[in-house]
């Protein structure tokens, strides 16, 4: 059989050599693009604004961005502090235990109170040792007892005042001047107190 026409020896390509023409063609523009980006990077809208701002303006922007976070941190700290102060533990600390005295102790303290309502330091120490409490508790007992004594006196005064007012009105209404007699035995004048407490004279 006749063989087909053979290619020119110069145009013949060795089949063993890989053909890289198609793969090399698109890579060259990519390399050129990478090189161009290194020489002149792309300019985005954000980069233009940042570069146009001066240093003080950038600092202001940073402070504004950090401001709300700092304020929120302060608010959280203040809330924690308020919760600590107004919690149940804080109310328990301010509660004071009340000292309960026996009848004998109360009688002894009342006896000294009747003698002196303001005991000196020496007397307070003696009472604290005899009763078995602290000096502070003795001072508190005397203070409370003085307040109680004052309240009782005020109540007694308020009860006495209305009675005295009523009796004074009755006395003023029924008070008469005695009849003044002359040497001849004839009455000269007599008088009575009126409602306005001004004496009225009736002369004869």
Curated annotation (Swiss-Prot):
Its main location: nucleus. Residues 94-153 bind DNA. Residues 28-73 are annotated as: Disordered. Residues 37-54, 62-72 have a biased composition (Polar residues). One of its GO terms (molecular function) is DNA binding. Keywords: Developmental protein, DNA-binding, Homeobox, Nucleus, Transcription, Transcription regulation. CDD domains: homeodomain (cd00086). Disruption phenotype: No visible phenotype; mice are viable and fertile. Female mice lacking maternally transcribed Obox1, Obox2, Obox5, Obox7 as well as zygotically expressed Obox3 and Obox4 are infertile: embryos arrest at two-four cell stage due to impaired zygotic genome activation (ZGA). The keyword DNA-binding applies. GO terms for biological process: maternal-to-zygotic transition of gene expression; stem cell population maintenance. It comes from the Eukaryota. The keyword Metal-binding does not apply. Specifically expressed in oocytes and early embryos. InterPro entries: Distal-less_Homeobox_TF, HD, Homeobox_CS, Homeodomain-like_sf. One of its GO terms (cellular component) is nucleus. Belongs to the paired homeobox family. Obox subfamily. PANTHER family: HOMEOBOX PROTEIN, OBOX1-RELATED. This is Oocyte-specific homeobox protein 1. It comes from Mus musculus (Mouse). The gene is Obox1.
């Amino acid at each position: 059989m006749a063989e087909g026409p053979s290619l020119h020896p110069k145009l013949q390509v060795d089949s063993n050599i890989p053909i890289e023409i198609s793969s090399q063609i698109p890579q060259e523009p990519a390399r050129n693009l990478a090189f161009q980006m290194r020489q002149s990077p792309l300019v985005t809208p954000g980069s233009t604004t940042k570069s146009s701002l001066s240093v003080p303006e950038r600092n202001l922007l940073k402070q504004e961005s950090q401001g709300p976070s700092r304020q929120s941190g302060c608010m959280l700290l203040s809330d924690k502090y308020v919760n600590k102060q107004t919690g149940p533990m804080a109310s328990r600390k301010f509660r004071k235990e009340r000292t309960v005295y026996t009848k004998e102790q109360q009688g002894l303290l009342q006896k000294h109170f009747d003698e002196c309502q303001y005991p000196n330091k020496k007397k307070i120490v003696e009472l604290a040792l005899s009763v078995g409490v602290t000096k502070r508790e003795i001072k508190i007992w005397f203070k409370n007892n003085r307040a109680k004594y004052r309240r009782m006196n005020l109540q007694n005064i308020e009860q006495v005042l209305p009675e005295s007012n009523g009796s004074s009105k009755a006395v003023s209404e029924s008070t008469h001047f005695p009849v003044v007699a002359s040497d001849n035995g004839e009455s000269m004048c007599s008088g009575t107190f009126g409602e306005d407490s001004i004496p009225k004279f009736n002369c004869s």
